[in-house]
Amino acid sequence: MKKETIFSEVETANSKQLAVLKANFPQCFDKNGAFIQEKLLEIIRASEVELSKESYSLNWLGKSYARLLANLPPKTLLAEDKTHNQQEENKNSQNLLIKGDNLEVLKHMVNAYAEKVNMIYIDPPYNTGKDGFVYNDDRKFTPEQLSELAGIELDEANRILEFTTKGSSSHSAWLTFIYPRLYIARELLKEDGVIFISIDDNEDKQLGLLCDEVFGQGNFVAKLPTIMNLKGNHDNFGFSDTHEYIYVYAKNKDVCSLGQFDIDESEVEKEWDEDEYGLFKRADTLKRTGQDASRKSRPKGWFPVFINSENKVYVTDDDKPLNEDDYVLYPVSPTGEELSWSWGKKKINDEFYNLIVIDIKDGKNIYKKQRPALGELPTKKPKSIWYKPEYSTSTATTELKNLLGAKLFEGPKPVPLITDLVKIGTKKDSLVLDFFAGSGTTAEAVAYLNEKDSGCRNFICIQKDEVINKTKNAYSLGYRSIFEITKKRIQEVFKKSTTTSDNAAKIGFKVIHTIDDFRAKVESELTLTNHTFFDDAVLTPEQYDALLTTWCVYDGSLLTTPIEDVDLSGYTAHFCNGRLYLIAPNFTSEALKALLQKLDSDEDFAPNKVVFYGCNFESAKQRELNEALKSYANKKSIELDLVVRN
């Protein structure tokens, strides 16, 4: 029987990274756990990896603290909104809207969603001085504690605590804020995943250097200037700003592939023709060009091609036309040089429909037809500067106002812009994450694109429960937090959707929120005067559900995975992804007997792990459960791991 307490590990600024090294390179550590640098260099040199002698890095006050934040466990638990989630339109959905500090939520997600996200889009605070960004941190450290955990001098620890506790909007504060979020976000991306990050000039340079550090310089894909306001922002000195930037980084550029844009109908009509085999346009001549194109270099490519009265191209084995009047063409250049055909005889006869005959001054020429990929519309590669009239910020504001019936949110991102990012960053079954959800543009873009191309993409949007200022119009209309606006927008989007319930996973959405980790409080209150070893932990319904949800995610289950209630002679247990959870008190001998019987008789019930809440199982009951499960030879020969968890 294993005992564990989730989120209780003592982490430092590099503890997780050292754990990775120890797991993969144990020979690089001595018996006392000290790292032997030369050993690792020997391994690298033996693999013929080229070592760079030149390097640079981004340093700022708070970098060690930011690394520590990335490694620290969450201080919260996850709870679901059961009333919302059990509604007909939401109960089978794979979409998620999560309320809470995004760093906390990301820390929870990494247990279940590591390498499961295809695309991330975020629109973080720009730190303009006017967007309200101030770094606030409610983690309580003494200078001595921070110095030890982050591996820094006491003086630096004091200076870091000064800006984290008093609030700061410096570059250092912004970098300290964004670093741990990007670090964990990378862990969530699939190996071929991609992240898009909107930013403006205020933190542009810092963000680029930071992304190089987090994702690797070699995984930089693009920095896209994006025209958001053609009129320009006249408040700036010297020039009227018309654009922002979108940084694009891959998790692994070697395996990442970005999509292309569909060509609209007017472009199709303008650039493409159509025959009975589909769309096409004229491509290269059938005559070979370039080096080694001559008859001498490729003698088998020299033969006559015939064109009949209907401009059908063909060849014959004996190099004689089927009709005397058919046109004869050899691969000769305009200067008279004898060349070769780029297709052989068999391909010419098999794919005559992919050739075009063009009349020219001195006779005829043959060109190949370029066709779009099978079953796909023609596409075009995205340009490195992004502009469409519908990317306008003012248009986005108007459209959101029309959707919600009033102006509730300042500066929403345009749906067409995010739709285009989703289009090139995903496939039809991808998972999209936005952990600065704001007004919910990403959710709407995913829903819109699904409707347009019959996709099954899902979104996870995370939004802090940020209080709305009483002077804002949204407050006067009854909204008390940005999250309420996000939720309302997504609800309205799905109300207007024509998507049917045939694919329930892509309509509706589930709501999850964070709550304070009550366990720490309970443990601190366990004294000899108010607690005995025979007391059970009294949990509210919300605490009970939060503990169950958090445990499931901690053990690797997605937040949308169904949790099945299991009746054990009046005791309710919970079954999820092969794990059985026992949280409630009063687990009786009858419940144990029912569990053993169910293991034998229910062919669909095959847990591989039993997790129970230690606070509700006294020591004697723990031993009884452990001995019974370990000694009982169930008919399915299931080996059960038993974990007591607090």
UniProtKB/Swiss-Prot annotation:
<feature type="region of interest" description="Binding of S-adenosyl methionine">
    <location>
        <begin position="123"/>
        <end position="126"/>
    </location>
</feature>
<dbReference type="InterPro" id="IPR002941">
    <property type="entry name" value="DNA_methylase_N4/N6"/>
</dbReference>
<comment type="similarity">
    <text>Belongs to the N(4)/N(6)-methyltransferase family.</text>
</comment>
<dbReference type="GO" id="GO:0032259">
    <property type="term" value="P:methylation"/>
</dbReference>
<dbReference type="GO" id="GO:0003677">
    <property type="term" value="F:DNA binding"/>
</dbReference>
<dbReference type="GO" id="GO:0008170">
    <property type="term" value="F:N-methyltransferase activity"/>
</dbReference>
<dbReference type="InterPro" id="IPR029063">
    <property type="entry name" value="SAM-dependent_MTases_sf"/>
</dbReference>
<comment type="subunit">
    <text>Homodimer. A heterotetramer with stoichiometry Res(2)Mod(2).</text>
</comment>
<keyword id="KW-0489">Methyltransferase</keyword>
<dbReference type="InterPro" id="IPR002295">
    <property type="entry name" value="N4/N6-MTase_EcoPI_Mod-like"/>
</dbReference>
<keyword id="KW-0949">S-adenosyl-L-methionine</keyword>
<dbReference type="Pfam" id="PF18273">
    <property type="entry name" value="T3RM_EcoP15I_C"/>
</dbReference>
<dbReference type="InterPro" id="IPR002052">
    <property type="entry name" value="DNA_methylase_N6_adenine_CS"/>
</dbReference>
<keyword id="KW-0808">Transferase</keyword>
<keyword id="KW-0238">DNA-binding</keyword>
<comment type="function">
    <text>DNA restriction requires both the Res and Mod subunits.</text>
</comment>
<dbReference type="InterPro" id="IPR041405">
    <property type="entry name" value="T3RM_EcoP15I_C"/>
</dbReference>
<dbReference type="GO" id="GO:0009007">
    <property type="term" value="F:site-specific DNA-methyltransferase (adenine-specific) activity"/>
</dbReference>
<dbReference type="Pfam" id="PF01555">
    <property type="entry name" value="N6_N4_Mtase"/>
</dbReference>
<protein>
    <recommendedName>
        <fullName>Type III restriction-modification enzyme EcoPI Mod subunit</fullName>
        <ecNumber>2.1.1.72</ecNumber>
    </recommendedName>
</protein>
